[in-house]
Amino acid sequence: MFKRTRTLNRNTTATLLSPASGDLVSLSKVPDLLHARRVLGPGVAVAPEDGLFVAPLDGVVRTSPRTPHAYWIRSEDTLGGSPLEILVLVGTDSCRAQAPAVIPLVADGQRVTAGQPLCRADLEILEAQASSTLSPVVITVCPEGTAINLGTAHATAGSTPLARLTAT
């Protein structure tokens, strides 16, 4: 699932859209060492302004009813035929929230298009019961040799580029 070695076609690019509206923040600011140290891969976090989260790219969603705050999206043909896998987390440690903080809008195995709603989150519950509302977006699988340019500004869900990936 997390294999990182594949051959890539040269001069191929892909753009990931922001899954939420808000300021883009370095993963190092996320209060979870797994993400802050980029153990799962490179990425950026979003400080969401509202509770709508959308797909950052076209692909197939993997999620679980027990973890409605985590969405893996796998795209088979994003960089020269090599897959990408992106993990979108809603909040940090949001699985600890006792009240239902995240309502899924997609099912496991469903095909999604970039900008399609994934879930709606209650940010007030997350603020009260999770470590943070900062929502990591991690590139967990990408072809070897991919240059990743991450965004650093304010983003609008489904329209602002979060990251640009380029074959080197």
Give the label of every model feature segment.
Residues M1-T168:
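Contiguous, well-folded functional domains in the mature portion of proteins
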